[in-house]
Amino acid sequence: MTQLFDTLGFIDTSAARTGAAAATHDAAATSTEPAGPAGAAAVSLEQVGKVFATPRGQAAALRDVTLDVRRGEVFGIIGRSGAGKSTLLRLVNGLERPSSGRVRVQGVDVGALDEDGLVALRRRTGMVFQHFNLLSAKTVFENVALPLKIAGVPKAERVRKVEALLELVGLAAKRDAYPASLSGGQKQRVGIARALVHDPEVLLCDEATSALDPETTQSILALLADINRRLGLTIVLITHEMEVIRAVCDTVAVIEQGEVVETGPVWRVFGDPRHGATRALLSTLVHDLPAELAARVQPLPEQAALPDGAQVVLDVRYTGESGGEPDVGALAAALGGSVRFLHGGIERIQGHAQGRLVIAAALRAEDAGQSTARGGAVAALLERARRHANHAEVLGYV
């Protein structure tokens, strides 16, 4: 529990300080730590590495990580279990020191801070956990008010602040309820309110929705997006779920075996993933062909012509790079008009239309008898499709 309170910035781990002396010291500590130049990144990692000692020797958890999180954005960090996501977050709030490189939060070098400086940092850096870590013997109000009480904030100010936060997270009616009577989503809302009590500049979320059902997850993500808009708060969100990234993040970084292998705007990474780890994480969102349809798709014959009445199956993808709406009508016209849509759809991510269409198109009458060897009519069909999409490939024929 001491580590939890330390993470939240509830306590000072240096010599005991109480009353007015503590308040004066905290104010001085805050005033001597610059917030960084205007326009600087809220969180910056420069060639950061982290090595842990194990019984088998040195183990690298992070390797040469360089990231910039812009002020006011929601930045998602995604990776599989053991990729190094949580280690990265612990470096940002000073629970771990980097083995190499530099971590800055609001322009302050986290690795250079002493214990007093770390306490001040954690009060400016809110933390939302996967597990709610609420005190069962205290009410919702008391759980949220606790860090303010420990920090010596006067009672009247505590009441004002906590009531405003409970209103913000939609729990005003649960003010006097105990954690045992709350749903998982309500408990996480308490955790979010508690993380905001010190008016943080950055909010760190460590798998904040992974213990929740899908409907509750969406409500918590909507709350985080609302807080980001209302308060202009920078949010760094750790997750292993691409659905979470798509729903709320502006920018995403993909971590694989301790290295950042891909980063960029969410729409770009989703529409045109460039690393195998990213494609693997996105596979849960990319729907494969239904089994009955996949069974019907036959490979193109290498030498012979297609059977009479056969149609070429094309996998057409839109990445959103053009910024406009996919002109599906123009695609159909370019393919000769005899087109069937077999599978897929278009969605919008950050205002960019992207998606996948699996279509069946007939060869032109004059080309229908040509051999498929060395391209020929099928290659011409594919080329026409590529003029109206970002990517297109032949899957076979039906």
From Swiss-Prot:
Q: Where is the ABC transporter domain positioned along the sequence? A: 43-282
State the membrane topology: Peripheral membrane protein
The keyword Cell membrane appears for this protein: yes
Annotated localization: Cell inner membrane
Name the principal localization, coarsely classed: membrane
Q: Does the keyword Cytoplasm apply?
A: no
Catalysed reaction, written as an equation? L-methionine(out) + ATP + H2O = L-methionine(in) + ADP + phosphate + H(+); D-methionine(out) + ATP + H2O = D-methionine(in) + ADP + phosphate + H(+)
List the Pfam families. ABC_tran, NIL
Enzyme Commission numbers on file: 7.4.2.11
SMART domains reported in the protein's UniProt record = AAA (SM00382), NIL (SM00930)
SUPFAM superfamilies (alphabetical)? ACT-like (SSF55021), P-loop containing nucleoside triphosphate hydrolases (SSF52540)
User: Could you tell me what this protein is called?
Assistant: Methionine import ATP-binding protein MetN 2
Record the organism. Answer: Burkholderia lata (strain ATCC 17760 / DSM 23089 / LMG 22485 / NCIMB 9086 / R18194 / 383)
